[in-house]
Structure formats: C-alpha cells, structure tokens
C-alpha cells in the first residue's frame, strides 16, 4: 500500500512515483473501505486529488462504510476539492450508502452557506422527491434564512412536509427566527397548514412564545380559532401558558373565548394566583363583554360561555371587572358623534372606515380606560382613510385641472363638482383602487 502511505505523507512526487512504479489501480481501497481519492480528500490535498482524478480515479466511488469523495469534502469543508470534483463531473446528488443523504443535505445540516451555494451552482437538486426529509426543512429548523433563500431560488418547495407532517413554516417558527418566518410567508408559505397532531402554524407560534410571529401569521390570514387534536385553540394555549402579549394579539383579531377543550376554556385555565394570569382573565372578560355588541360575532360554544359567566360571578374581582366593562360599553353607546349622531360604540365595531373618517375630529379616548386601545385603533383607521381620500382628491384635481386658455363649452367635469360630492364618489372606491400617483 505504498500509494496510501505516499498520500498520507502529502508528497506529490512520491504519489506520482507510487502510482507509476507499481502500475497501481487508482480505484483501489484499503482495509477500511477508503479509496485513494478518499484519503486525498481526508487530508485536504487538492493537488493529489487532481492527480488521482487524472489517473482515472472514480469521483463517485463509495463503499458500504465510506460515502463518496464529495460527501467527505462537503463534511470537511474542503471547498477547493468540491470545485475540483465538480470539474470532473461528479454526481452532486449521489446518495451515500449508509446514511442516504446527499452532499447538499450535509451542507445544509452544517449551516454552510458557501458550500450550499457551491453545490446549487453546480446543479445539486434542491427538491428531490425521494428524500425522507427536505433540505429546506433542515435549513428552516436551523433558522438559517440565507440557506432557505438559496434553496427556494433553486426550486425547493416552500410548503414541504417532513416526518409528522411538519411543514417548512413550522420548522421556521420552532427555530425562533422571526425574519425567516416573514420571508417564508412573503414567498407563499401557507399560514394555516397543520401537522399530524392538528397543530397549526399559529399553535406553534404560541408555543414558541412569540407575539410577533402570532401577529404576522394572523396578518397573512391564519385562522385565529383553529383547534388542535384536543380541541385547544391558540388562545387556550396562550392563556394556559400565561402569555399575556400573545393573548392580547389574539383577542385583537377577535379570537373566540368560548372554544373549549373538554370543559376547560381560556378563562378557566388562567392562573389567578399570578398578576399575569389575572390580567389575562381581565382581557378575556373585556372581550366577552364587547363581543356581544359586534354584529358579525358569533359565539361558537354557548354552553362554554355560560360556564365562563358562572366563573366570573363566583369571583368578586372578575365580577367587578365585568361590571366595569359593561359600564364603559354603555358610556361608548351613549357617546354620539358627527352629523349622523353615530354612537362611539357603533363606530368602533360596526362602521366602515368612511364613516369613521367623517367623525374623526369628534372621536376621543378621553374618559375611557378599558376600551381605550379599541378607540385608538378606530381613530387610526379613520386617519388612514382620511389621508387616502385627501391624496386621491389631490390627484383627481390635478388630472382634471381646466386649461384657462380653452373656451368653456358648457360641459361639466370633475372640477365643477361640489367638494362633498367628490368625497362621496371617492368613498365608494376601495383603498387599493384609489387614484394614487
């Protein structure tokens, strides 16, 4: 085995001499199942690897105990040798015999961005349907945004599933990388996919404890009241885990407080021995009270709601809070605004943005505490719509500005309309269709 010893020494001339002197087979293997090329790769010697390949060494050779040279070069991060092997038309998608993984999968597992890009540039398959797992799911599980981008650009499916029907978006959420979750959603990841236990992306985000992820998923259309295999909603999990910020986000998106798991509801699992648990209970109660005024809200489980009301009545602190909520709702109902004399309660819950914009100068949070955030959000809606209408009006005015040098032919156009009618016309146009420039 003079050739193996020469390769181990790293002496190029000795390798050439050993190969020529004994008329050695360039694909010979030693007692450990390693070929000459494998040994050169293990030693990171690019020059010797090139000599062996020129002498006819098989770049795709593997044994029962040894993967291909490319596998080893990737694992050892020998970038020059990887490029060399590619020059000799090595198969970038070769599976090693005992692990059934491709070189690309190893590069992804190692979080090696440079190696991943190199393999993809040489045509490695980013989406091999015969893989037990998908490289993009490994990258997402590692929370590696850059590698995920490379794989998606190379054709990886963004809604791939791995063992347990865990989707790419689930892996990303569990990695804790918020930017990766945003990237996947912006690239078309489905927000409502479920694993084999019926845990949705929203469930995973709640279990990860990320209010930002929860908000982003909801903004991308995730179902707020989805249930897992035990009937638990994201709100139930958040209340049970005392995740106050997440509870607030879910309730802002009108999560139903009555969906139960067995006889338990989000309210019943609140930890009333902690300040956070009490605050969560108050958030749920205030939502229960205001929801009765929302014309589009339907209680999913009336029996569970009745049980919650019994819990509230049996606890003095919760009962007092419910009474305060009812009192503030009545105050909002009696506060009428604008020429149409709409109630503040109706504006906040049941009116469109145009109606809010008309009453914008009259709406105030002063004197309100429990539902102050709801009123502030209503004001924000009105401001945004008012700004959009003003911007559209300005565009229309410029577009129809009369040429003073042109003789008036008696025809009426936009410029001749009263301001009130102009606003009435623009109000009938959806936000995305307003004439912006």
From Swiss-Prot:
Transmembrane segments: none annotated. Coiled coil: none annotated. InterPro entries: Ankyrin_rpt, Ankyrin_rpt-contain_sf, PRANC_domain. It comes from the Viruses. It holds the Pfam family Ank_2. The keyword Isomerase does not apply. ANK repeats lie at residues 32-61, 65-94, 99-128, 131-160, 164-195, 197-226, 230-259. Keywords: ANK repeat, Repeat. SMART domains: ANK. The keyword Secreted does not apply. PANTHER family: ANKYRIN REPEAT AND PROTEIN KINASE DOMAIN-CONTAINING PROTEIN, ANKYRIN REPEAT-CONTAINING PROTEIN-RELATED. This is Putative ankyrin repeat protein FPV014. It comes from Fowlpox virus (strain NVSL) (FPV).
């Amino acid at each position: 085995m003079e050739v193996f010893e020469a390769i181990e020494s790293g002496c190029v001339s000795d390798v050439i001499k050993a190969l020529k002197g004994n008329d050695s087979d360039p694909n010979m293997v030693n007692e450990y199942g390693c070929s000459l090329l494998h040994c050169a790769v293990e030693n990171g010697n690019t020059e010797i690897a090139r000599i062996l390949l020129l002498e006819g060494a098989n770049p795709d050779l593997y044994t029962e105990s040894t993967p291909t040279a490319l596998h080893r070069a990737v694992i050892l991060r020998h970038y020059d040798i990887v490029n060399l092997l590619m020059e000799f038309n090595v198969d970038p998608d070769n599976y090693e015999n005992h692990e059934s993984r491709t070189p690309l999968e190893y590069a992804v597992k190692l979080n090696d961005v440079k190696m991943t890009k190199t393999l993809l540039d040489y045509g490695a398959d980013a989406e091999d349907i015969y893989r037990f797992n998908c490289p993009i799911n490994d990258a997402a599980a590692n929370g590696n945004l850059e590698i995920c981008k490379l794989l998606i650009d190379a054709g990886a499916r963004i809604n791939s599933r791995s063992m347990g029907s865990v989707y790419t978006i689930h892996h990303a959420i569990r990695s804790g990388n918020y930017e990766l979750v945003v990237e996947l959603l912006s690239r078309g990841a489905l927000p409502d996919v479920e694993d084999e236990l019926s845990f949705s992306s929203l469930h995973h985000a709640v279990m990860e404890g990320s209010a930002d992820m929860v908000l982003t998923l909801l903004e991308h259309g995730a179902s707020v009241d989805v249930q897992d295999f035990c009937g638990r909603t994201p709100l139930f999990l958040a209340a049970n885990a005392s995740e106050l910020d997440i509870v607030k986000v879910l309730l802002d998106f009108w999560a139903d407080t009555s969906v139960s798991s067995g006889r338990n509801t989000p309210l019943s699992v609140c930890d009333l021995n902690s300040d956070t648990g009490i605050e969560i209970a108050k958030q749920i109660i205030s939502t229960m009270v205001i929801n009765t005024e929302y014309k589009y809200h339907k209680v999913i489980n009336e029996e569970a709601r009745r049980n919650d009301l019994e819990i509230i009545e049996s606890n003095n602190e919760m009962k007092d809070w419910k009474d305060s909520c009812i009192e503030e709702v009545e105050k909002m109902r009696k506060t009428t605004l604008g020429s149409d004399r709409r109630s503040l309660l109706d504006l906040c819950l049941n009116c469109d943005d145009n109606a809010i914009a008309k009453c914008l100068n009259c709406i105030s949070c002063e004197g309100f505490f429990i539902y102050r955030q709801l009123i502030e959000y209503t004001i924000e809606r009105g401001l945004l719509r008012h700004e959009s209408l003003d911007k559209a009006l300005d565009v229309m005015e410029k577009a129809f500005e009369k040429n003073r040098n042109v003789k008036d032919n008696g025809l009426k156009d936009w410029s001749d309309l009263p301001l009130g009618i102009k606003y009435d016309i623009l109000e009938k146009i959806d936000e995305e269709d307003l004439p912006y420039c």
